[in-house]
Regions:
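Electropositive
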Residues: 17-114
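Positively charged n-region of N-terminal signal peptides that target proteins for export
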Residues: 1-4
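Bulky hydrophobic/aromatic "packing anchor" residues in well-ordered structure
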Residues: 38, 109, 133, 206-207
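Structured segments of extracytoplasmic/periplasmic soluble domains
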Residues: 44, 67-75, 112-116, 129-132, ...
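Short, surface-exposed secondary-structure junctions/capping segments
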Residues: 48-60, 119-138
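N-terminal signal peptide c-region/cleavage motif recognized by signal peptidases
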Residues: 13-15
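Mature, structured domains enriched in cysteine- and short glycine motifs
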Residues: 116-124, 135, 139-242
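Stable alpha-helical elements in mature extracytoplasmic
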Residues: 64-68, 101, 105, 110, ...
Length: 242
């Protein structure tokens, strides 16, 4: 078992920063030189939007990240390293907690409604925490949202809509709101990404601000804070960046 301990401070703009730590979204952060994704849960992507209880769009991905940062504050965090991320080998899977607390960050995020359990890696864990958040409409559950995995796949037509604010019979209209191609850039996340439909499915291409194609991309499907984030979701760099 590998254990890392570090302090985490809240930052209000861009990725949350502290000495040796960067929080990129609601379930991923870097401790020293190791990037951890929290085991068994799935938080909104940093550029993901959700609908609130009134049906209005709000930046739930940024909010989930900021709530995690605020919860930790300046307290020390411990991460138990569970091995490499099967999706992106440069990241590690972690079960993390504030050093003096028994509740893990994984559990806290699901219980407070800022993440959902992620099967099959959850292996049945976090069901009680998710049920509690759903019944009490905490966090994401107050409105309507798509599972983060569906956003990553850009599963516009088949995305599962969940939350207390989802309206039966309005699924198509809701999906159009949630899968937007004009989403505003999250603070500190300037990398534009487009999805192109190919015979084998969608291909994701990202454009750095230094790329010749950057200004020509007017309507981005996705935004990323770093190249690592884009690569972790299967996007490739635009040819104009080479």
């Amino acid at each position: 078992m590998r254990v890392l301990i570090a302090g985490l401070l809240l930052a209000m703009v861009g990725p949350s920063l502290a000495a040796g730590i960067v929080v990129t979204d609601g379930d991923t952060f870097q401790l020293d030189h190791t990037t951890y994704r929290l085991d068994g849960i799935d938080a909104p992507e940093i550029d993901q939007t959700c609908l609130d209880q009134s049906g209005d769009v709000w930046p739930c991905g940024v909010t989930a990240r900021d709530r995690l940062s605020a919860y930790i504050g300046n307290r020390a965090v411990r991460c138990e390293d569970k091995g490499p991320d099967p999706v992106y080998k440069h990241r590690r899977i972690g079960i993390c907690s504030i050093e003096s607390e028994a509740t893990t960050l994984n559990e806290w995020l699901v219980r407070e409604g800022w993440a959902i359990k992620f099967e099959p890696s959850a292996k049945g864990r976090f069901a009680a925490e998710e049920a509690d958040a759903r019944v009490n409409r905490r966090g994401l559950w107050q409105g309507c949202f798509a599972e983060p995995r569906d956003l990553r796949r850009w599963n516009l037509n088949g995305a599962r809509l969940i939350g207390g604010g989802c309206q039966a019979g309005h699924e198509n209209r809701t999906r159009v709101k949630l899968f937007r191609v004009d989403t505003a850039m999250p603070p500190g996340c300037p990398i534009k990404a487009k999805l192109a439909l190919r015979a084998v499915g969608y291909e994701g291409i990202y454009h750095l601000p230094s790329c010749g194609s950057y200004r020509r991309v007017k309507r981005a499907n996705r935004w990323f804070c770093s190249e690592e984030d884009a690569l972790a979701e299967g996007f490739r760099k635009a040819l104009t960046c080479r």
